[in-house]
Amino acid sequence: VEEIERDGFGDKPAFWCVLAEDNGEVAGMSLYYIRYSTWKGRILYLEDIIVREKFRGRNIGTTLLIRTLKEAEKMGVNGTRWQVLDWNEPAIEFYKKYNCTFDGEWINCNMDKKQLKKALEAV
């Protein structure tokens, strides 16, 4: 919690979020930030849309996506980007409704802290 508070709610937030509430209870959220592409400039990256299980099926995910896309438009970015796991068929079907492009060309590369340290030690 401390890391989230520091990184998202300080003077220079690393991310922003949209919260969905139902009678004062958090029902879901989207978390996003700006990234920069050498080809496309400023892009809003949607890290997550999460809807708590008991609130699913009530268009909360739709509301969160639309609100996040409106934030992207307001920020004047050149587009949005996000990832979805290839096995997450419900999410894939959800995103298809919004005419997004599914890009099979890129392969994601990741390093956790341990891998990062090991890579730097090898130099």
Annotate each PLM feature.
Residues V51, G57-K70, E93-K97:
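Conserved acetyl-CoA-binding loop-helix of GNAT-fold acetyltransferases
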Residues L19, E25-Y33, I50:
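Conserved beta-strand in the GNAT
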Residues F15-L19, M29, I43, R81:
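Short hydrophobic/aromatic beta-strand element in the GNAT-like acyltransferase core
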Residues W82-A91, N110-K114:
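Conserved beta-strand-loop-alpha-helix junction that forms the acyl-donor binding cleft
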Residues V1-F15:
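Active-site rim helix/loop that mediates acceptor-substrate recognition in acyltransferases
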Residues V77, K96-E105:
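Conserved acetyl-CoA-binding loop of GNAT-fold acetyltransferases
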Residues R42-E53:
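Conserved acetyl-CoA binding element of GNAT-fold acetyltransferases
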Residues A72-V84:
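Conserved GNAT acetyl-CoA-binding A-motif
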